[in-house]
Each structure stands twice: as C-alpha cells, then as structure tokens.
Amino acid sequence: MLALGLLVLGVLALRLLFESGQLTVARQRLIDTADAAALSAATWRARVLNFHAYSNRAIIANEVAIAQAVTLVAWAQYFETLTRNSAAFGAYLPPVEPVLGVVAETAALAAQVSRATAAIEIPARGSPHVGYKTLLQSAQEVMHLSSLGFGLNMVTAEVARASHPDHFAWVLPDPTQGWSGFTARASEGADRKRVADLMQASLDPFIRQPRSEDIHTPIPSLCLNLMRLRKRGVTTLSEDLERWESVDTLSFHLRRLSWFRCREREALPLGWGAAEAGQVLHAVTATSGDLSLNPMARQLAGESMFSTSGYEGIARLRELNYESLANTRFPSARLAVIARRDQGEAHSRMWALSSAEVYFRRPPGAPQRTEYASLFNPYWQARLAEPSVAERALALTQVD
C-alpha cells in the first residue's frame, strides 16, 4: 500500500510539474507575443515617419523641378529672341547671315519644345487636383491615418494571431493623444516659408542667384570707356509663395556725356524672355536682379511671357509638431500593447503588457555627427521600452 501511495503521489507531482511547465511556457509565449506586437506597431509608426521623410524630400525635389522648368522656358525664350534679332542684324553681314539664320531656327525650335514640355510638366507636378505633389500629400495623410488606433490594432491583431490562434492584442488608448499631435500638416505662413527656404537652398546656382553679366563691346563712347551689353536675369518666388517667375534680358547700353557727367541708359533691347507658374499676371513683378536696368527688355519679356496656372504654390508638408513635443531635438513616441490569451473561462485568461517607442537616430554606418530629429531624413526606428506606471495602471482597466 505504501508503494502504491508513493506511486500515486509521484504521478500527481509529475502532472502538477507538467501543468506548471505548460503554464509557464504559455505565459512566456504570451509575453513574447505582446513584445512582438508592440515592436511591430512601433515599427509601423517608424515606417510611417520615414515615409513622410521620403515623400517630403520628393515634394521638395518636385518644387525644384518646377522652378527649373520655369527658368528653362524663360531662358529659351530669351535665347530665341536674341538669336532672332542677331539674324536680323546678320543681313548687314552676308558671310555670317546663313549661320545666324540656322542658329535662330534652332533656338526657336528649342523654345517651342521647352514651352510644350513645361505646359505638361508643371501642371503634372503642381496641379492642386491630380498633380504629383498633391498625390504625395494625400499619401502622407493615408499613411498617417494607418498609424492611428484602428490601423495599428490591425497590425497587433495579425501579429498575435500568427503567434497563437487564441492570442489577441491591441494598442492601449493614449489619454495624452501624444501620437495624434506628434506630426502636423504645415498651415501657417511661417511653416511654408521654412519649406520655401529649404527648397531654394536646394536650387542650383544658375536658378538661385541673379544671372547678371556686363559685356564690354569694342564701341567707344565720349565717356572715354566702351559701350557695353548688360545681361540681367532672375528666378523668384512671390512673397505669398504661390507663384514662380523667371526673367532674362539683354540690352545694349549707350554711354554719353550730359552736363559734363557720364550717363548710361538702355538703348536697344536685344534678348528677352519670361515665364510664370501659378497666378497668371502676364507681367514681370520681380524687383531683384537689377531688372530695372533693362526696362524696355523687361517690358517686352512681360508682353510675351509664358504662363501656366497649373501650380498652387509651395507645398504644405507634414512635419514634426514642435509645439507639442516635450523634447524638440530628440522626440520619441511611446505606445503600449496588451495581449490576452483565452482559455475558455474568463477567470482563466492570461494577460501581458509590453511597451515600445519610436525614436530618431542616424544609422550606425552614417558619418558620426549629431543630427536633430526631423521629417526630412528617414532615420526613425523602433525599440522595446519598459512600461511606465501610467501604462500599467491603464492596462489594469482593460483586464476583466
């Protein structure tokens, strides 16, 4: 009897040990599921931020391309009028007249092609309805919505289900609405001005700087110096950030004595061209670049200005909402995930809590330098974090 009793006790002990082991394995598996779900949700949010960074860079490049297109059309029209006028003067120089005629025809064809291309490209890039920029901005909004409660819960639910059919996981609600205010669409003028400054810094020198040059001719003047050609050109963005304008002019300037003083004035416009994208004004409004030195050429450029209304101004990017961030240099966004395993009865359910955060850090292989967080470089990552006291308290309200 004693041996039989010991055998029964041994079997019961083995069963208890087995069930305890099974429970420990199940609990650890649920903890791992919660960690995986939290990290997956945070990773998705990091990818959303990185998408914003990539799309913001694409939008900036798109704005640069529009500025380049406007500048190219203006310069092509300027070169067309310059070569056409040169060909007219070539009638007085028979040996070079055929060459100047061919150059003028080629320039006219190039200007025609540039206008036709810009008429398609600028609306395709900047149209407020179906432009590439608008599509990128809409994609940013869709991605942002996917990182909110419903979309994020779909991620955690799929991760939990892949771990075990009886596992469920969801993101705990954030009473501070930290993620909702983590980023925001630029709306204020100062926000758009910052984007415009970044875009203009990305322009090549030919577009960003005034295109000014003084060319001395062999024609003497009574001022004891030579007559000169004055080239003036500039590409500008209007103060309201809604219109691009580019102008190029070249005029012959006459120097003469007047009341014992040497004076200079525009005598003959030789080349001119202008283009605008946005609000159609058919007039040169730029005040920079010394365009006033060639008033006649400037007026002719405005009268023949290429115009397209298929542009709605500098883009409104989605950026970090610095006003709502506790740390504006290295902000992070937390989330907490609670996982549950159903075992039939409500009292037999198991629960697990895990937290993760999204943070900004340059990759290990990048040059060693300090870089503050932004939505222009895709360096957002995710990692697990220790649940906070507030998250633990909130999780207790979810347990039944």
Regions found by a protein language model. Give the residues of each.
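Alpha-helical assembly-interface signal, strongest on the long, hydrophobic N-terminal helix that forms
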Residues: 1-74
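Long, compositionally biased low-complexity segments
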Residues: 61-400
